Amino acid sequence: AILGTLSGENNKLLMLGNPTKTSGVFYDSHTVDRALYKCHTVNSENVARVNKKNIENLKKKYGKDSNVVRVRVYGEFPTQEDDVFIPLSIIEQCSSKLYELPDNNKLPYIILGVDIARFGNDETIIYRNAQGRLKIMAERKGQDLMATAGDVIRIYKKTINEFPEYRGKIYVNIDDTGLGGGVTDRLKEVKKEQQLYRLAVVPINAAEKIETDTKAGKEAAEYYNDLTTHMWACLKELIEHKEIEVEDDADTVAQLSTRKYRIASNGKIEIEGKDEMKKRGLKSPDRGDAAALS
């Protein structure tokens, strides 16, 4: 519609933006319609006031040819791979830097998503989904399980004070595979000891098949090969419909936008495993998993 206002002799159109999407008028102005526009690309490497150390960290972490570096450093449009599960463009549109979830569109629950580190370089991450607003509440490396349980209890109590109008349960969806079982057991003990009746501990084995004892479970099991894929699909759907606001955290955005998927031999969608991502030189998607758990 805006192009229709340019019929006047001296009318001009100025567009400024981050090149996150590979569609739309802004993308066309730099590609198929480039002859109609005078395009300027700002490369952060050539800007004096930009912290060059941050640029090098991004390159080291995600690779100089990654979409994260292309968009956030070079000012270039992403070369979106067909097998990436959640496109960078839709994640950016829900970033708290650009988007604020309307108060009348809040989700009716508060959930803590807890992803427990498996190895020394992995992170233990606690994400809080407070009625649709996702925020990192704790990030730890090399922390023992009891300290992680203490983090969860502290965040639970903090959340009750921050949201006095919310009277429902506060769910803790915790990665119960491997080391996570110890945190689950301790949380159940503390809940009983301190009579934390609004604390609902939900152990999740993300590697398991989807339970089919409900209608929703049966429908999900027709499309997704395991619980991890289903959780990420739910997160993707919320992002696509702008039903959540995701904290503007570079690591979270990168992890969400680089995880791939495939069609398994049974015809169902299956998301890339953590070990497969590490073989590609990527970090374990701890933040992405915690966000999906929440």
Predicted features and spans:
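Well-ordered alpha-helical segments embedded in enzymatic catalytic cores
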Residues: A1, I125, A147-I155, D289
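ASCE P-loop NTPase helicase motor core
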Residues: A1-D65, V183-P203
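A short alpha/beta connector and helix-capping loop motif
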Residues: T5-G17, E123-G132, D176
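Mg2+-dependent endonuclease catalytic cores in nucleic-acid-processing enzymes, primarily RNase H-like
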Residues: T22-V25, A130-K268
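ATPase catalytic-site recognition across NTP-hydrolyzing enzymes
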Residues: V47-V114
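Gly/Thr-rich phosphate-binding beta-strand-loop-beta motif of the actin/hexokinase/Hsp70
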Residues: N105-A130
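Charge-patterned, long linear interaction tracts outside catalytic cores
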Residues: G113-V114, E247-S294
